[in-house]
Amino acid sequence: MLNIGLSGSTGKMGETILERIDKFKDCKIAAKFNSTNNLDDLDNFCKNSDVIIDFSTPEILEKLINYALKHNTKLVIGTTGLQPQHFKLLEKAAQTLPVLYSANMSIGANLLSYLAKEVTKILDDYDVEILETHHRNKKDSPSGTAVMLAETIASKKGLNITFNRGNRLRSEKEIGISSLRGGNVHGIHEISFLGDDEIITLKHEALNKNSFSIGAIKAAIWLQDKPSALYSMQDIYKI
């Protein structure tokens, strides 16, 4: 039986994972950590977990990694809003532990990323813009998924990523990301390839959080026998 530690257990993603975990026979939630705990509680939390699924806040990541290293606890990180210093921590931890990071753990969003990469190879001279829409209470903007998609395309086209174009003209060497916030939207991501004569748009819409939670649990199960490295969901789906 795989013992999973759930960090961010009282958040929306944590609650959804708790609702879905019973569908998986070979794992259980063995430990929980949330905003009511002290950071030092991460010690026993990691000790009692084989793999941790983290949907908390960037502020606890360094402590979480330190205790995970102490107890050799594998990490699945889904927390968004991470900054460059956080990714450096993940890369360093992955030299010792298997670590999986993804801004979006649904198969649909990862297929969207794969399709965007393939379309980019063909539509090399098209402009690319990304529009992401989320509920009114989402804190980070642009979304981690939008950044993931933009980075995937930019790596193939050698483009810069622009979050706020302001009043300046669009350059030929950039991908723009625009954000909408409102309602109770779980997540919509649209990638538009704009040519002079036609527009091709790829779109993914999450109808609820189930696909994210199922992806996170699958990631924890998949990671349990992997060697130390930094993985993504595309390693699981082999795309």
From Swiss-Prot:
Keyword line: Amino-acid biosynthesis, Cytoplasm, Diaminopimelate biosynthesis, Lysine biosynthesis, NAD, NADP, Oxidoreductase
Subcellular localization, as worded in the UniProt entry: Cytoplasm
Chief place of localization: cytoplasm
Keyword Amino-acid biosynthesis among record annotations: yes
Enzyme nomenclature, EC number: 1.17.1.8
Binding site for (S)-2,3,4,5-tetrahydrodipicolinate: 135, 144-145
Pathway: Amino-acid biosynthesis; L-lysine biosynthesis via DAP pathway; (S)-tetrahydrodipicolinate from L-aspartate: step 4/4
Residue sites binding NAD(+) per the record: 8-13, 78-80, 102-105
Matches recorded under InterPro entries: DapB_C, DapB_N, DapB_N_CS, DHDPR_bac, NAD(P)-bd_dom_sf
Reaction(s) catalysed by this chain's protein: (S)-2,3,4,5-tetrahydrodipicolinate + NAD(+) + H2O = (2S,4S)-4-hydroxy-2,3,4,5-tetrahydrodipicolinate + NADH + H(+); (S)-2,3,4,5-tetrahydrodipicolinate + NADP(+) + H2O = (2S,4S)-4-hydroxy-2,3,4,5-tetrahydrodipicolinate + NADPH + H(+)
Name assigned to this protein: 4-hydroxy-tetrahydrodipicolinate reductase
